[in-house]
Amino acid sequence: MAQPKRFQINAKHYFLSFPKCSLSKEEALEQLLQLQTPTNKKYIKICRELHEDGQPHLHMLIQFEGKFNCKNNRFFDLVSPTRSAHFHPNIQGAKSSSDVKSYIDKDGDVLEWGTFQIDGRSARGGQQTANDAYAKAINAGSKSEALDVIKELAPRDYILHFHNINSNLDRVFQVPPAPYVSPFLSSSFDQVPDELEHWVSENVMDAAARPWRPVSIVIEGDSRTGKTMWARSLGPHNYLCGHLDLSQKVYSNNAWYNVIDDVDPHYLKHFKEFMGSQRDWQSNTKYGKPIQIKGGIPTIFLCNPGPQSSFKEYLDEEKNQTLKNWAIKNAIFVTIHQPLFTNTNQDPTPHRQEETSEA
């Protein structure tokens, strides 16, 4: 007579199902953690569900650091802490931890311990699995959640194509720049020259009312005169200080105008595109794809006097005569000699803003 087959499972990941188990997830986890095994436990996930007959069931995924050769079919038995009852599971080696994890997630009443170990395998296999992974990523609530899904379900793509995946998810989960809230109303700037007020009335407005080619403005003046705070109080805008970042995280194509603050005109990229309110232009990035700029909005250039800041001095350089002739047709130039506000109408301009810009 053939000997009965001995129980033995040699696996790194185990899938346990406890039918009619009244233990809570926390009680089950506490007992599992007390089990002595030759290899360390890395991750445990427990799901509690109620079947149609109302009986509670527990499903568990256990991941070990190395393979665990289990020869005792009672090894994972659990006991009730309040009554004389044992709970015996169905024990299987988990061919795909990702599939088991997804399966026991279905009811939502779960408890996790440790860090999930990605195995990169799926019982479903093939192209369908890759499609499922990316579909799940698209349906995730955020970029970080989508990256976690791809890392778990498509680890090869995650490693080999991370740059493209990361860039594409920036577009899929594009978050518009947080709107700037000015600490001062534009009306609190009571010393604004008439030519600035007139320029605002003619050029700063939403797309429906805006001129097809608005005129930009260059405002030059000493530090702490309120140029930056005034310029930022006029409406929805893009604020670019020190250097130009046209990424979607910073730059919005729905802004009414741009503010370029404290950028040396000698090194100002896209000088004509900004000053000329040009439409539909591209900006090449060093490590990414070109960025499409909708344009058609005016720009406020803020600067201080001096050879490394003043737009007037820059355009007066002999080599820039042609550019100067173009600039005076596309922008007005205003020099201010006193603050745009009085102390009775607002406190001195915040130091934090001025520390980042000498404008």
Swiss-Prot record:
Record motif RCR-1, residues: 15-19
Residue positions binding a divalent metal cation: E49, H57, H59, D107
Domain CRESS-DNA virus Rep endonuclease: 8-116
Note describing how the cofactor binds: Divalent metal cations, possibly Mg(2+) or Mn(2+).
Protein residues bound to ATP: G221, D222, S223, R224, T225, G226, K227, T228
The protein's assembly and partners: Homooligomer. Interacts with the replication enhancer protein (REn). Interacts with host retinoblastoma-related protein 1 (RBR1), and may thereby induce the transcription of host replicative enzymes even if the cell is not dividing anymore. Interacts with host PCNA. Interacts with host SCE1 protein.
Region (Oligomerization): 156-176
Motif (RCR-3): 103-106
Domain of life where this protein originates: Viruses
Entry's EC annotation: 2.7.7.-, 3.1.21.-
Names of required cofactors: Mg(2+); Mn(2+)
The entry's keywords: ATP-binding, Covalent protein-DNA linkage, DNA replication, DNA-binding, Endonuclease, Helicase, Host nucleus, Host-virus interaction, Hydrolase, Metal-binding, Multifunctional enzyme, Nuclease, Nucleotide-binding, Nucleotidyltransferase, Transferase
Claim: Hydrolase is one of the keywords in the record: yes
Swiss-Prot/TrEMBL domain comment: There are 3 rolling circle replication (RCR) motifs. RCR-2 is probably involved in metal coordination. RCR-3 is required for phosphodiester bond cleavage for initiation of RCR.
Protein name: Replication-associated protein
UniProt record, GO biological process: DNA replication
Cellular localization per UniProt: Host nucleus
GO molecular function annotations of the record: ATP binding; DNA binding; endodeoxyribonuclease activity, producing 5'-phosphomonoesters; helicase activity; metal ion binding; nucleotidyltransferase activity; structural molecule activity
Function: Essential for the replication of viral ssDNA. The closed circular ssDNA genome is first converted to a superhelical dsDNA. Rep binds a specific region at the genome origin of replication. It introduces an endonucleolytic nick within the conserved sequence 5'-TAATATTAC-3' in the intergenic region of the genome present in all geminiviruses, thereby initiating the rolling circle replication (RCR). Following cleavage, binds covalently to the 5'-phosphate of DNA as a tyrosyl ester. The cleavage gives rise to a free 3'-OH that serves as a primer for the cellular DNA polymerase.
Motif RCR-2 per record, residues: 57-59
Family recorded in the similarity comment: Belongs to the geminiviridae Rep protein family.
The species this protein was found in: Tomato yellow leaf curl Sardinia virus (isolate Spain-1)
GO cellular component: host cell nucleus
